[in-house]
């Protein structure tokens, strides 16, 4: 049984192409989820958001396309394609789509 699901194995793929932005929505695709790690691909339509919450583990965001605004413990960070942001465990954080954007979220 594979640990990573919902994506082809042993193929070179464009990661951003594995999910589509849908108007007025936040779309997600989970690649891995267990007690130790989660890996989820997100596509945000401009203006959409995930409200403030916290996480049991450190969260690493890798922005694939577009620009997202992340608020971590009250500090705002504007991240564009190619940027990485670490959101430490237990710190409140939120995400806002400054424009259509895609990101990979890994929580450990």
Map each language-model feature to its residues.
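Conserved short histidine dyad/triad with adjacent acidic residue
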Residues: 24-25, 38-55, 89
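Short acidic-glycine-tyrosine-enriched beta hairpin
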Residues: 74-89
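A short, N-terminal "cap"/entry segment at the start of jelly-roll beta-barrel domains
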Residues: 1-36, 71
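A cytosolic small-molecule/anion-sensing beta-strand core signal
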Residues: 64-65, 80-81, 99
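Short, surface-exposed secondary-structure edge patches
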Residues: 41, 60, 75-77
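Ligand-binding loop in jelly-roll beta-barrel domains
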Residues: 89-108
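Glycine- and acidic-residue-biased ligand/ion/polar-headgroup-sensing regions
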Residues: 57-69
């Amino acid at each position: 049984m594979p640990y990573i699901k919902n994506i082809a194995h042993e193929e070179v793929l464009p990661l951003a192409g594995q999910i589509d932005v849908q108007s007025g929505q936040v779309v997600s695709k989970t690649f891995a989820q267990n007690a130790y790690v989660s890996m989820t691909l997100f596509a945000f339509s401009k203006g959409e958001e995930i409200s403030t919450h916290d996480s049991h583990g450190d969260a690493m965001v890798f922005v694939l396309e577009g620009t997202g605004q992340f608020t971590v413990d009250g500090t705002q960070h504007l991240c564009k394609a190619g940027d990485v942001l670490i959101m430490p465990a237990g710190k409140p954080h939120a995400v806002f789509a400054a424009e259509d954007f895609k990101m990979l979220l890994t929580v450990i």
